[in-house]
Amino acid sequence: MREKLNLLAKLKSVVYKFDPLNPNTRSIRSFIPLTTCKRSRQLAPECSISFDLGPQNTSPVIDIKFVNGTEKSIKTDTLELMSIVESIELLKKSIRIEEIEKMKTTETTLQDILQPVNKKKDTGAKANR
């Protein structure tokens, strides 16, 4: 069974920058429908998508802004469609790892670990005999 993919999850904006007449834009042009289709837009309505059609011979780039404010650019002139999808998913996973590392955890010292735990006396049925 195919895994459902939500490319726009955790993204605040996506900007496609490319020259439509450049022959190296095949991958970026095939990626655009994945983010502009009805299902993708319904799953992430807060993500804005825009296009910047640049001058001739501009190399194709996807600028991504994540919900936490991080911005990344992906140059797509030498990438295939699946490589673009995988790189975006890896970026989202790395953002998630950074968020987890930033979370404060209670620090446990070696003294706390080695200190014995005080147990209450068993007052069950055996103690009442």
From Swiss-Prot:
Where does the source fall among the domains of life? Answer: Eukaryota
Localization, UniProt: Mitochondrion
Q: Per the entry, what span does the transit peptide take up?
A: 1-50
In which broad location class does this protein mainly occur, judging by the first location in its UniProt entry?
A: mitochondrion
Q: Sorted alphabetically, which InterPro entries does this protein's record hold?
A: mtLSU_mL53 (IPR052473), Ribosomal_mL53 (IPR019716)
Give the keywords, sorted.
Mitochondrion, Ribonucleoprotein, Ribosomal protein, Transit peptide
* CC per GO annotation: mitochondrial large ribosomal subunit
Q: Which family does it belong to?
A: Belongs to the mitochondrion-specific ribosomal protein mL53 family.
Name of this chain's protein: Large ribosomal subunit protein mL53
What is the species of this protein? Answer: Dictyostelium discoideum
Q: What gene does this protein come from?
A: mrpl53
